[in-house]
Amino acid sequence: MISDESDRFNPRDPKPADAGKPSKSAKRREARKLATQALYQWHMAQHSLNEIEAQFRVDNDFTDVDGAYFREILHGVPAIKSEIDSALKPCMDIALEELDPVELAVLRLSTWEFIKRVDVPYRVVINEGVELAKVFGATDGHKFVNGVLDKLAPSLREAEVKANKR
């Protein structure tokens, strides 16, 4: 079949309207980064979530951030903190109180995603958690986070994990 000339790529054509805009996954990644920082602040300073959210929205450019996802994480994690911490404890050989606060924030965020956002594949949850730990955590913190999330996934996403091992 001969292609019509109009189907050919022309480098002089203007870019599509959405060219250069971050993808949904990129916006979510940025939301997770800010949420990790906000959860760390919540854990350390015990300020109200609304105060923290307002501060983050003033202090950060949310143009390339999924603001709704940021809010969902920031308010969602504390809402089920006891459930999250109960799920994490059997996967670690260290008490939650002894954990680095940054790694704790990452683990809580990732556990929340396992529990509440089943639309996000478990492998994505693990990968995003590891990446957050690389950015914000201690030198080898990402290895610890990876190990914990790897142990946690089968208990919170059993069917999905089994289906992916076939």
Swiss-Prot record:
Q: Name one GO cellular component term.
A: cytosol
Residues folding into a coiled coil are none
InterPro entries reported in the protein's UniProt record: NusB-like_sf, NusB_fam, NusB_RsmB_TIM44
- Keywords annotated in UniProt: RNA-binding, Transcription, Transcription antitermination, Transcription regulation
Key word Glycoprotein present in the record?
no
A GO BP entry is: DNA-templated transcription termination
Record has Transferase as a keyword: no
Matches recorded under Pfam families: NusB
Region Disordered: start and end of each range? Answer: 1-28
GO MF, any single term: RNA binding
In which residue ranges is the amino acid composition biased (Basic and acidic residues)?
1-18
User: What does the UniProt record say this protein does?
Assistant: Involved in transcription antitermination. Required for transcription of ribosomal RNA (rRNA) genes. Binds specifically to the boxA antiterminator sequence of the ribosomal RNA (rrn) operons.
Q: Which family does it belong to?
A: Belongs to the NusB family.
Name it: Transcription antitermination protein NusB
In its UniProt entry, the species of origin is given as Pseudomonas putida (strain W619)
